[in-house]
Amino acid sequence: EIHVGAGAYICGEESALIESLEGKRGTPRNRPPFPVTNGYLDQPTIVNNVETFAAAALIALNGGEWYAGIGTKHSAGTKILSVSGDCERPGLYEYPFGVSIAEVLADCGAGDTQAVQVSGPSGICVSADEFGRRIAFEDIPTAGAFMVFDQRRDMFEVARNFVHFFAHESCGFCTP
């Protein structure tokens, strides 16, 4: 079954997601017990994202050796990027690990780009002089978010927006 959560940022954490699915506030649970033994409705539960299940299906179909042959020496397989922001063709893109930021920008139709935020608001901001860097564990690991900012954007305002986002989305357990 596929369930749609409430959409809160904290619900990306597995136990907060389970709380949300149970109709409660999406707050992380104390552990132990872990979801694998006491998860959704106190039943054994596995929580994975769609990308993991998609990769597992391809591995089951084509074999682990095939999958390991995609990507780089230290980052096997593919990565799904959710590309958004100042580009002509936002959307979901799947690349072999090792793709450069410049390649992604070309594919999504980004022009006059000053920066890319990789891995969402808690990730890193990469400036234009670093667009040769690669999406891979050995260079820029990512959770999949890829936000494009062109020259019209005030990067101070972008940073301020991220700070407001975290203030609003905080679950209240982390201290400043």
Report residues per predicted region.
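Ferredoxin-type iron-sulfur electron-transfer modules in oxidoreductases and energy-metabolism complexes
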Residues: 133-176
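Active-site loop ensemble at the mouth of alpha/beta enzyme cores that anchors a bound cofactor
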Residues: 20-32, 129-143
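A generic structural signal for well-ordered coil/turn residues at beta-strand boundaries
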Residues: 77, 89, 112, 142-143, ...
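Local cysteine-cluster metal-coordination motifs and their immediate loop/turn environment
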Residues: 9-11, 114-124, 164-176
